Amino acid sequence: MIEKSTMATRAKSNTMRALDDIRGGFDQRELWLYLGWREIKSQYSRSIIGPLWLTLSMGMMVLGLGVLYSEILKIDVANYLPRLAIGLIVWGLINGIIIGACRIFSVAGGAMRQIRMPVSMFIFQFIWSQLLVFAHNFLVYIIIAVVFLMNPGWNVLLFFPALLLVVLSGFFISMILGPLCARFRDVPMIIGSVMQIVFFMTPIIWSADQMPRRAWVLTANPFYHFIEIIRDPLLGKTGTALNWTASIGITIALGAIATVFFARYRARVVYWS
């Protein structure tokens, strides 16, 4: 009985320390906002257009795939290109977070051993850098919206809570994958391979309407729900109740799992990195 009480007290103590770590990490926002921007900027040092290469690369991919697959799928390019662009841009954010989360603490290991600071600070920095990449890529959608005279109307406001759900889920995933991948170095390769398969199983290049008989496959795909709640408002739609409910439910579940996982392994990350 005493042993169970001690274990419960210890778990509660670890959870409180983890929450304090997250609060402390957020309080360091001036530092991680600067470091996140510097990380992106340093990748394109001495380049003429700098981080705008992100925008240019995404633009060329959208244009190339859009022209090709609109012919293959026999879809009007004016209808296909905006949908494809948003799908690729959102996938870039999701994929970047999941793949990059595996390297958070292996990259920050040196700094963690030399400077005492909240472990979550490095997660905040990473998520911020991914948002900066997303912002550069999002310029492609803005250009397409202007070219094709798109008017999503007031539904576009739903884009902001949708993006918040994606970012929160990304933060929670990073709290899990960061320590996990620091401990087991084969996990990043496994995740990288899985994400390549998931890309083709998610309606990014193709549309969900093209697979009506296998709708359950989409329902079981969490990436589909997150992409749709962002894509629909930008196309002037509200999104389905299923997509929103699934996205909110997944975010809450990830938050609960991440809190328990981070509370248990947060203190060991510095030894694994």
What are the functions of these language-model segments?
Residues 1-273:
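Hydrophobic transmembrane alpha-helices and immediately adjacent juxtamembrane helices
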